[in-house]
UniProtKB/Swiss-Prot annotation:
List of residues binding Zn(2+): 408, 411, 426, 432
Pfam families the record matches: BRCT (PF00533), DNA_ligase_aden (PF01653), DNA_ligase_OB (PF03120), DNA_ligase_ZBD (PF03119), HHH_2 (PF12826), HHH_5 (PF14520), Nlig-Ia (PF22745)
Annotated function: DNA ligase that catalyzes the formation of phosphodiester linkages between 5'-phosphoryl and 3'-hydroxyl groups in double-stranded DNA using NAD as a coenzyme and as the energy source for the reaction. It is essential for DNA replication and repair of damaged DNA.
Gene name tied to this protein: ligA
Protein's name according to its UniProt entry: DNA ligase
Organism from which the protein derives: Salmonella gallinarum (strain 287/91 / NCTC 13346)
Cofactor section: Mg(2+); Mn(2+)
């Protein structure tokens, strides 16, 4: 694997993790600014190597998957997100792209609004009556929050006025005013309840309560900003006109909406809002800029995950200066050693900040950072800030260098840094308590073995008390042993035991992902499972054979080969199987016996499909003997191009690979 491929893999893994924490768990770990930085870095790398763009890349999707505690609602019209710009130059470039696509030299009329920092929701009215509401979820499927939305007084249960459409789906943001947020936290501190980090987390946590009575006690509000379904009625042909119509029907709309007839007017609006931001009474993180004309919006269309006619112009993350008092080193699941700066506590955006991640040794070297330095930290509404730069002009005399450990700070094992990698790793494996904790947390996670109720704090205690050393030990736990843990009663303990028993029935792909093999994410695990079919075949595969799996290169193949070559890993797998972990036997597909134009072909999907989901398409293609890959190469036999197909289509045309559209794919699927 080339260095850029490894960078892409690590970036995608990190972004997916933080998308899950942000969109699903409502517990983000990093500021929006840091997420945006990672996303920009990923986009830039993918622009350099478009042939390495994969369908599951965070740049190709909208959000994260919904929880299963709520019923699911499928969005008839996908809830897309917006692309971001961060400075005047980027906005002016966006403005020019719009004018170029419209083939116009005249100024576009923009409708400018506030970018609210809450939770995006969809609300469906039928004949003017509220019938359902859902979160964005992954943009295609969200959570049914109808009962909770009904408790928000700002949202009308019945629209009033004339010419209300038979079916109208409005979209907007549920948020918590700062006064309400402060009262919730004040009450929580007094009663010993949960204190929220910021209004956005409080709004999300309030809206996604399983008990609507709790939601009803929270002072949530709502602003409408768009439309999804529109049937049996009409709306004005401008965005501003639609907002005014929504307001006439009783839907709340922000009064901070302005038409701008030039890029300069947009910039003026942006600056004025930024200046007024502290006095608004609720959190925003930028402004949203939309082409006002619906006809021009239709002409501009969409890319895979966002409209071409709108952009979010984000505010710079808020910054403060403080001192680095010390640097500690944390060890992750794969042994990665991450330096963490311990800061002189400082208030940033209303939150007391005392820690900042420093990523790796290269980051420290690039910053020129020393312990004792005065630094600028940046934070954008969430928890972990970043160190932006060192204030060299105010460097104290008593600073000292940051020395990376030569031995693991947890287990004492040697550390290594592979040439070409930025990460320093502990070599201790499962003898390292830190790696053991993180490996076990990964093993039981929702996308892996999905052990309900087995949270991080339980894993921490199990490792610290030496009840559990390997994943197999989890399945030997009894309710009696679990009852001895903090905050774990007999009923909760039995629920965990039951969840562990249920988790034994899994899939081969989930099992592989749960093992935590380096570089093997969900997509790679699924590819390995589909290609080899059985654990025995995978365990005995050579590095060359592993590379025959779509999207598996030399680096991933080597990690997989080395994992199964390690006797201790094979022993743990044997114990897991002995404890009853199992999955359905593979359905053997003899490609020679399949009468399908896709049999034996390596196929790549690109662009948006309108007749079925991408996952459905992959499943149907695989059932007909195709190998579905994530990137175009000389090994690719066929590319299926949906709407807004981009770099993969261009690469296929460059290589002379056969390309068909979605309609032809559907015809051939039925052949």
């Amino acid at each position: 694997m080339e260095p850029i491929e490894q960078q892409l893999t690590e970036l995608r893994t990190t972004l997916r993790h933080h998308e899950y924490l942000y969109h699903v768990m409502d517990a983000p770990e990093i500021p929006d600014a840091e997420y945006d930085r990672l996303m920009r870095e990923l986009r830039e790398l993918e622009a350099q190597r478009p042939d390495l763009i994969t369908p599951d890349s965070p740049t190709q999707r909208v959000g994260a998957a919904p929880l299963t505690a709520f019923n699911q609602i499928r969005h008839e019209v996908p809830m897309l997100s917006l692309d971001n710009v961060f400075d005047e130059e980027s906005f002016l470039a966006f403005n020019k792209r719009v004018q170029d696509r419209l083939k116009s030299t005249e100024n576009v009329i923009w409708c400018c609004e506030l970018k609210l920092d809450g939770l995006a929701v969809s609300i469906l009215y039928e004949n003017g009556v509220l019938v359902s509401a859902a979160t964005r979820g992954d943009g295609t499927t969200g959570e049914d929050i109808t009962s909770n939305v009904r408790t928000i007084r700002a949202i009308p249960l019945k629209l009033h006025g004339d010419n209300i459409p038979a079916r109208l789906e409005v979209r907007g943001e549920v948020f918590l005013p700062q006064a309400g947020f402060e009262k919730i936290n004040e009450d929580a501190r007094r009663t010993g309840g949960k204190v929220f980090a910021n209004p956005r987390n409080a709004a999300a946590g309030s809206l996604r309560q399983l008990d609507p009575r709790i939601t009803a006690k929270r002072p949530l509000t709502f602003f409408c900003y768009g439309v999804g379904i529109l049937e049996g009625g009409e709306l004005p042909d401008t965005h501003l006109g639609r907002l005014l119509q929504f307001k006439a029907w009783g839907l709340p709309v922000s009064d901070r909406v302005t038409l701008c007839d030039s890029p300069q007017a947009v910039l003026d609006f942006y600056r004025n809002v930024e200046k007024d931001r502290p006095t608004l009474g609720f959190d925003i993180d930028g402004v949203v800029i939309k082409v006002n004309s619906l006809a021009l919006q239709e002409q501009l269309g969409f890319v895979a995950r966002a409209p071409r006619w709108a952009v979010a112009f984000k505010f710079p993350a808020q910054e403060q200066m403080t001192f680095v008092r010390d640097v500690e080193f944390q060890v992750g699941r794969t042994g990665a050693i991450t330096p963490v700066a311990r800061l002189e506590p400082v208030q940033v955006a209303g939150v007391l900040v005392s820690n900042a991640t420093l990523h790796n040794a290269d980051e420290i070297e690039q910053l020129g950072l020393r312990i004792g330095d005065k630094v600028v930290i940046r934070r954008a509404g969430d928890v972990i800030p970043q160190v932006v730069n060192v204030v060299l002009s105010e460097r104290p005399e008593e600073t000292r260098p940051i020395v990376f450990p030569t031995h693991c700070p947890v287990c004492g094992s040697d550390v290594e840094r592979v040439e070409g990698e930025a990460v320093t790793r502990c070599t201790g494996g499962l003898i390292c308590g830190a790696q053991r904790k993180e490996s076990l947390k990964h093993f039981v996670s929702r996308r892996a073995m999905d052990v309900d109720g087995m949270g991080d704090k339980i894993i921490d205690q199990l490792v610290e008390r030496e009840y559990v050393h390997t994943p197999a030990d989890l399945f030997r736990l009894t309710a009696g042993k679990l009852t001895g843990l903090d905050r774990m009663g007999p009923k909760s303990a039995q629920n965990v035991v039951n969840a562990l028993e249920k988790a034994k029935a899994t899939t081969f792909a989930r099992f592989l992902y749960a093992l935590g093999i380096r570089e093997v994410g969900e997509a790679t695990a699924a590819g390995l499972a589909a290609y080899f079919g059985t654990l025995e075949a995978l365990q005995t595969a050579t590095i060359d054979e592993l590379q025959k799996v779509p999207d598996v290169g030399i680096v991933v193949a080597t990690h997989v080969f080395n994992f199964f070559a390690e006797e201790s890993n094979r022993d743990v797998i044997g114990q897991l199987l002995a404890e009853g972990v199992h999955w359905p036997a593979p359905v053997v597909i003899n490609v020679q016996e399949i009468d399908s134009p896709f049999a034996g072909k390596t196929v790549v999907l690109t662009g948006s499909l309108s007749q079925m989901s991408r996952d459905d398409a992959k499943a149907r293609l695989a059932a007909l003997g195709a190998k579905v890959a994530g990137s175009v190469s000389k090994k690719t036999d066929l590319v299926i191009a949906g709407e807004a197909a981009g770099s993969k289509l261009a690469k296929a045309q460059e290589l002379g690979i056969t390309v068909i559209d979605e309609a032809e794919m559907i015809r051939l699927l039925g052949a």
